[in-house]
């Protein structure tokens, strides 16, 4: 995983914010991918990856929980 993948993931969530169910699913998937990359030492800068992924918190959409 590269930082560009995280940036692209955040961008995709922003593009899907009008469908909160999809946006929330994408956000959960992005967080899991970032955590897995960090846990398996497959990212060069864990702090930057996490910081970039957390930018999804600035995207306004409802979070759906079942």
For the regions a language model picked out, list residue spans one by one.
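N-terminal acidic leader/helix
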Residues: 1-25, 63-64
């Amino acid at each position: 995983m590269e930082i560009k993948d995280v940036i692209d993931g955040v961008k995709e969530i922003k593009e899907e914010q009008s469908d909160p169910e999809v946006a929330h699913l994408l956000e959960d998937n992005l967080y899991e991918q970032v955590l897995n990359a960090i846990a398996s030492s497959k990212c060069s800068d864990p702090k930057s990856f996490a910081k970039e992924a957390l930018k999804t918190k600035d995207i306004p959409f409802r979070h759906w929980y079942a």
